């Protein structure tokens, strides 16, 4: 049976880059790997994919193949058939640092076989919360308190997991490494892979007598009040991190972190401006303030502020109050501006006395609206 074109096997072209060929190979090797694909013919396709990649990812072999095709390797071309080396040889000879562990480590959940020593104890799990703030809290910061159900280091055994420290022994299966080597059959090849020890669950220890409080886990569950000091200069959607305030590690490592995502209470008064430290404040004035240009006192997040209304102001106009917006960041004292967005209130009804005065004003006014038809 004639061999298929190697480019066709991998689904690439002669102009494909080395990285594109590697990417195509990765996908197909995983797709047809015998441990992942039990369909009939998968193993043969897996071998075919490996053979194609071993040529197209070797610059010399690829050049010969592009010139002579399959004949370059069957001894009829005058070059002599170099043949295909072992499976491991193929990976070790491929360029760009690509090797067996890079491609298949995720198939078995472990790292590269025989290349790493015992990993350190894993970090505790992180916790995620959302803190919904008022605009004043967002600008100036606030201390929030909340109750968390935490995994904490056992108070009785101090995380050892045993009644007495002398009751702790090295795991006899992994010799304290926390990981063991297992053999995986990959078609005609056998590969060693490093995985977590199933006897000690990666801890590397065994217990003669487990702690009665935590049953050997080294941790216990506790409800705890946590104070969260949220600083100034935060932004909705931003995450504030408290290191070491998450769950305790099950393996004696460092605790996880507490991530607080910032939210904001909806307001009819204040508005945020995307990608800006300025803050909009909606403010209603009377039609008399708009006409006369009065001075008003407005209640801002910083307290009362005097604001001069310009004569003839219109609804939607912005009046700037400097340095009363959001802080630039958590450490800066510089702030954006407060933009007062004017809304003019027109009364729907007036008293007889007001109406009389308005009529007199109307007589004095020289305003003549233009006829838009003209």
UniProtKB/Swiss-Prot annotation:
Zn(2+) 2 binds at residues 171, 174, 197, 200. GO terms for cellular component: cytoplasm. Binds 2 Zn(2+) ions per monomer. Its cofactor is Zn(2+). CXXCXGXG motif repeats lie at residues 154-161, 171-178, 197-204, 211-218. Keywords: Chaperone, Cytoplasm, DNA replication, Metal-binding, Repeat, Stress response, Zinc, Zinc-finger. Zn(2+) 1 binds at residues 154, 157, 211, 214. Participates actively in the response to hyperosmotic and heat shock by preventing the aggregation of stress-denatured proteins and by disaggregating proteins, also in an autonomous, DnaK-independent fashion. Unfolded proteins bind initially to DnaJ; upon interaction with the DnaJ-bound protein, DnaK hydrolyzes its bound ATP, resulting in the formation of a stable complex. GrpE releases ADP from DnaK; ATP binding to DnaK triggers the release of the substrate protein, thus completing the reaction cycle. Homodimer. This is Chaperone protein DnaJ.
């Amino acid at each position: 049976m004639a061999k298929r074109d190697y480019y066709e096997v991998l689904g690439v072209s002669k102009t494909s880059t080395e990285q594109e060929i590697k990417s195509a190979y990765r996908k197909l090797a995983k797709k047809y790997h015998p441990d992942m694909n039990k369909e009939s013919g998968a193993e043969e396709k897996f071998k075919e994919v490996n053979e194609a990649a071993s040529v197209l990812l070797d610059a010399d072999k690829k050049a010969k193949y592009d010139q002579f095709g399959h004949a370059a390797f069957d001894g009829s071309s005058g070059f002599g058939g170099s043949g295909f080396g072992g499976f491991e040889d193929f990976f070790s000879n491929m360029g760009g640092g690509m090797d067996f562990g890079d491609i298949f480590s995720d198939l078995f959940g472990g790292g590269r076989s025989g290349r790493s020593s015992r990993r350190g104890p894993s970090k505790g799990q992180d916790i995620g919360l959302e803190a919904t703030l008022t605009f004043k809290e967002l600008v100036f910061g606030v201390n929030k308190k909340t109750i968390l159900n935490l995994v904490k280091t056992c108070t009785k055994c101090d995380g050892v997991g045993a009644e007495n420290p002398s009751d702790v022994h090295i795991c006899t299966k992994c010799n304290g490494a926390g990981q063991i080597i297992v053999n995986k059959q990959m078609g005609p090849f056998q590969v060693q892979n490093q995985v977590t020890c199933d006897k000690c669950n990666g801890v590397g220890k065994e217990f003669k007598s487990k702690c009665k409080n935590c049953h050997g886990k080294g941790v216990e569950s506790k409800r705890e009040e946590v104070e969260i000091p949220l600083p100034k200069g935060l932004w909705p959607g931003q995450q504030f991190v408290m290191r070491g305030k998450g769950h305790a590690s099950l393996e004696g490592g460092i605790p996880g972190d507490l991530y607080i995502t910032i939210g904001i209470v909806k307001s009819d008064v204040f508005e945020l401006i995307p990608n800006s430290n300025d803050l909009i404040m909606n403010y209603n004035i009377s039609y008399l303030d708009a006409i006369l240009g009065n001075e008003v006192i407005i209640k801002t997040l910083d307290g009362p502020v005097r604001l001069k209304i310009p004569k003839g102001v219109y609804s939607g106009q912005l009046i700037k109050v400097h340095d009363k917006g959001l802080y630039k960041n958590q450490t800066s004292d510089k702030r954006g501006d407060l933009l007062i967005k004017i809304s003019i209130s027109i009364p729907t009804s007036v008293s007889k006395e007001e109406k009389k005065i308005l009529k007199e004003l109307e007589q004095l006014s020289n305003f003549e609206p233009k006829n838009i038809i003209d």
